[in-house]
């Protein structure tokens, strides 16, 4: 995103021969992508997976029959199916299990240890039940956690580190992440368990704690729920469970782990095919030969696939990666490689949807505009087929809003103007690009999206506004951390300090992080509350926001994709499980 700094690059004519990105180049050569070969899509693997699904369903029925600890066993089953990424095969079983648990759920006390009739309320079972029920949109109150405080109003634990207690604290930590605005007890639970679990990992007296459980604790602290996307979580938990010998003693658990590995590899094989189509599309385009922008089409594919991985959303994923690639080209053009006058002409060309308006601009800008029109028109035609109506006017209006926000930033830079924080955030939400990125993808998820439903999931809906705000805050917060080292200031930080001269840069950064924390809680609420929007649409938008938290966890993973981001790509997209 454009930085509010003493930059004169947009006020002077640029030498076209010197137009080159200062970021590292493409890491994923098309020849390498096309060379990805795997037999995991062969019929025998699909047949084995289908057989395992049926075996596990039968084992579920058998193990739950006349079970003395039926509530906790059902919750553990739901949790492991979800952590291993195979829950889509057992939606009926999960629904039945949670309906059963909810029948015995007490809003003030939770559920008991052992059987459903137990009067002894259990910390672990209640926290696990709360998390599962809330994520599946049952009405559960966080007040239930008040039961597990002492007379001083603090959560309690023993002075010794025991495996059962570590498990309880881990479960409570995971539950506390699904909080809504104003839930003080959830904030208290998160602070308490974070401190406890951190001490467990750094302590020396943990010999009585299973190493597999310690790996779970390490994962939970390093990758909290809002950056623990389904594919990332599945790969990580498959590896954790595979090292847990005591867990693997169960026949059912062995079958579950075998299915999880098989399912992961089958999906990865399908994702290879999509990645190859995407790579061919990019490498065969004229824009591929230009060097002024970040070439990150594979990274953008990872962003979407870690959250929306199901086979039926193939077109949605490829579209998401294409639009992200296009937006990055525009981002780098408006940020660095176009003069203000050139950008005004480019923006007007988009408003009129007219290639002739850019005839007199440099070749790299004309190539960019032609790539923009070709890509947009191709996808608009695809949308018309899927939605059974012409959506071009709606889509074009969204592009206008996006590029007008970029142009506003370019004008601020050219004038050396630092806007107020509110002005910056209002414009920055639009320039985040989430509006156009989510629009194409939602329209190509394979379901009809009537106008009234579209208004509830896209702009100006609350959930969409929160996704846009998340993108802006994540980007600005990480820009501050990484760019202040080189003497540059991330825009939101600088604007806040201008409005509040008594604040330090760290104060401003903390303010943005506080806004992000509140935004996450509001997103949780929008995600789980019942309305007329199909859950698949909500999950998509929600996981796009969560994906940014993972990609920006250590640094801007799009700017610098040759470190953690590269590792993520190999883990999720390249290397199969063995």
From Swiss-Prot:
Signal peptide positions are: none
Enzyme class of the recorded protein, top EC level: lyase
Q: What Gene Ontology terms describe what this protein does at the molecular function level?
A: magnesium ion binding; terpene synthase activity
Per the Swiss-Prot or TrEMBL record, what residue ranges does the short sequence motif DDXXD motif cover? Answer: 331-335
Reaction(s) the record says it catalyses:
(2E,6E)-farnesyl diphosphate = longifolene + diphosphate
Q: Per the similarity annotation, which family is this?
A: Belongs to the terpene synthase family. Tpsd subfamily.
Its protein name is Longifolene synthase
């Amino acid at each position: 995103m454009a930085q509010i700094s003493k930059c004169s690059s947009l006020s002077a004519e640029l030498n076209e021969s010197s137009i080159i990105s200062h970021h590292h180049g493409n890491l994923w050569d098309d020849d390498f992508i096309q060379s990805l070969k795997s037999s995991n899509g062969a019929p025998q693997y699909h047949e084995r997976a289908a057989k395992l699904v049926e075996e596990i369903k039968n084992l579920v029925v058998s193990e739950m029959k006349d079970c003395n600890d039926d509530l906790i066993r059902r919750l553990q089953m739901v949790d492991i199916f979800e952590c291993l990424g195979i829950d889509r095969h057992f939606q009926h079983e999960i629904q039945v299990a949670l309906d059963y648990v909810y029948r015995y759920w007490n809003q003030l006390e939770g559920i008991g240890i052992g059987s459903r009739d137990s009067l002894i309320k259990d910390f672990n079972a209640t926290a696990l039940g709360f998390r599962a029920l809330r994520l599946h949109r049952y009405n559960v109150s966080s007040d239930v956690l008040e039961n597990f405080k002492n007379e001083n109003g603090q959560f309690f634990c023993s002075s010794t580190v025991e495996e059962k207690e570590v498990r309880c604290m881990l479960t409570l930590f995971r539950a506390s992440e699904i909080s809504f605005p104003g839930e003080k007890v959830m904030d208290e639970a998160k602070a308490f368990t974070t401190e406890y679990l951190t001490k467990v990992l750094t302590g020396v007296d943990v010999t009585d704690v299973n190493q597999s459980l310690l790996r779970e604790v390490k994962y939970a602290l390093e990758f909290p729920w809002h950056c623990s996307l389904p594919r990332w979580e599945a790969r990580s938990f498959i590896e954790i469970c595979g090292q847990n010998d005591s867990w693997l003693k169960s026949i059912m658990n062995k079958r579950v782990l075998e299915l999880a590995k098989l399912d992961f590899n089958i999906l990865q094989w399908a994702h290879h095919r999509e990645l190859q189509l995407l790579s061919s599309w990019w490498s065969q385009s004229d824009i591929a030969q230009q060097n002024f922008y970040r070439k990150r089409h594979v990274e953008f594919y990872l962003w979407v696939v870690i959250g929306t991985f199901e086979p039926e959303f193939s077109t949605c994923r490829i579209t998401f990666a294409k639009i992200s690639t296009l937006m990055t080209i525009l981002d780098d053009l408006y940020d660095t490689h176009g003069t203000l006058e050139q950008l005004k002409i480019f923006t007007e060309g988009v408003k009129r949807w007219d290639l002739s308006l850019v005839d007199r601009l440099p070749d790299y800008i004309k190539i960019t505009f032609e790539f923009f029109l070709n890509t947009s028109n191709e996808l608009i035609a695809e949308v018309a087929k899927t939605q059974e109506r012409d959506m071009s006017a709606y889509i074009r209006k969204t592009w206008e809003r996006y590029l007008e926000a970029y142009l506003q930033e370019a004008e601020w830079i050219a004038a050396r103007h630092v806007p107020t924080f509110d002005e910056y955030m209002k414009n920055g939400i639009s320039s985040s690009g989430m509006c156009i990125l989510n629009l194409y993808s939602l329209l190509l998820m394979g379901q009809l999206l009537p106008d009234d439903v579209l208004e509830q999931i896209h702009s100006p809906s609350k959930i969409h506004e929160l996704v846009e705000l998340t993108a802006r805050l994540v980007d600005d917060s990480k820009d501050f951390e990484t760019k202040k080292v080189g003497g540059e200031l991330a825009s939101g930080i600088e604007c806040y300090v201008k409005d509040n001269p008594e604040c330090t840069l760290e104060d401003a950064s903390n303010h943005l992080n506080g806004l992000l924390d509140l935004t996450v809680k509001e997103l949780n609420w929008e995600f789980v509350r019942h309305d007329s929007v199909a859950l698949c649409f909500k999950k998509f938008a929600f996981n796009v926001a969560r994906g940014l938290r993972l990609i920006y966890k250590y640094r801007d993973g799009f700017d610098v994709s040759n470190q953690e981001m590269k590792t993520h790509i190999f883990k999720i997209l390249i290397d199969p499980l063995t």
